[in-house]
Amino acid sequence: QDTNNLQSRILQLLRKDCTNIAVVGDDAQSIYKFRGANVQNIINFPDLFDDCKEVELVENYRSSKEILALANLSYENFATEGFSKTMNGQFSTGYKPVLMRPDTDEAANIEVANGILDLISIGVPADKICVIARKSRDLFGVEHLLNQHQVAYEKRGGQKFLELRGILDMIAYFRFASNPMDEISLFRLLRLHHGIGDTYASNICELLGIVDNPIINNKYTGFKFAEELRRLHQVFETAKTIPNEDVETKFALFEAFYSDTCARAIKLMKTDEATRTEKYEELESERANIQQLFLIAQQYHSITEFLDALILEQARVEDDKDVKKVVLTTIHSAKGLEFDTVFVLGCVDGLFPQIPIWEMGEVDDSDEEIQEELRCFYVAITRAEKRLYLVCPRTAVFYTGVFKTRITRFLDGCRNTYQESDSYIRLE
């Protein structure tokens, strides 16, 4: 089910003078369209090869009957093509999957983290607990809380939160604002500006403690990038006027300056337009990551408290290979895996399936992108063996503000297959 058109054509040519061929696949788990995979290769297989014999493998030895009841019904309700089949579970747990509906994204992350702590306390091995999200950045909130609780985890399908470039850049602003002698942070920030390379940045950093305000009091006042240095100096002067407790305002100041600085650097860089466009797209992705950092920062009473928490997190990043770890993963990296307990984040219509706000209500469920999202949903929920938690906060932060959410459409018509709760509930 994950083959592309070229691979399908090669298969047809190899089979040209031979009738012996067998393939195994599941059209419901074809989720690599973005890599060129074409689900039609398996759907149309009986038409492409004469005298094709179909054998249905419908016995599922992984998930409970309760989890499969939800998976089967959801897929049956929304799939507009493919093979019709019902997966049969081999055991029952006696409890249905849980739809968790906390008030906010932050509350949802807290409930998931508390759930993980509870599961570990009752004997569920950490490496048999998995948190799945559509995108890697959607895992940042849970990742932050696990760090706080000193719960070991491994990240699949993306870098760890505190390893991301944009996150490290933003932290550097806060660190230098709190400690103007922080040479490492200043060097990082100087390198963001167009025209300032390693040598210039190092020379300026060497002036720390020797002259006042080395960002503007240096030998480069006549250079082309002098205006960039003046801007950097000014943003820190402005930051001094903002109380340490006003986390939101200070964060907004640095985020706006960072975005503008990076955009200016991209605009002025000598490159072709295709590369420039790619750089702008990378910046937008970094800004989305920074939005997640902002949601975390809002939970603290001051910048100092926020930085102290981040320092502790970074100290815990070192991996202990002998410790069992909770798995945080994207859907695409979870395929083929199985876990005792699975939390699926972001079960919000518009996020899962991914539909831009301005297109809500205009996209037909038969659209191939929606069908791909349905298959992603199916893969996510069928990673669970015994316990499945679907997380849909009642409000969520989108680009233009905070909105009331709608439960993912993939649960429409499935109400009898799950139970609903405002918070985590223990299933045993």
Model region roles, listed by residue range:
Residues D51-K53, E59-V151, A177-N179:
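Helicase P-loop NTPase motor core
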Residues K219-E338, Q354, T417-S421:
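Accessory C-terminal helicase-associated subdomains
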Residues D17-N20, D26-A28, F49-E54, T93-P97, ...:
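Short glycine-/polar-rich loops that comprise or flank the Walker A/P-loop
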Residues D2, V24, K135, L192, ...:
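Conserved helicase core region in the C-terminal RecA-like lobe
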Residues M170-M181, D365-E373, T382:
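Conserved RecA-like P-loop NTPase helicase motor core
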Residues L48-F49, F91-K96, V124-V247:
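ATPase/helicase motor core of nucleic-acid motors
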Residues T395-E428:
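Helicase C-terminal subdomain and adjacent C-terminal extension
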Residues Q1-N41, E59, S63:
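Conserved helicase NTPase motor core
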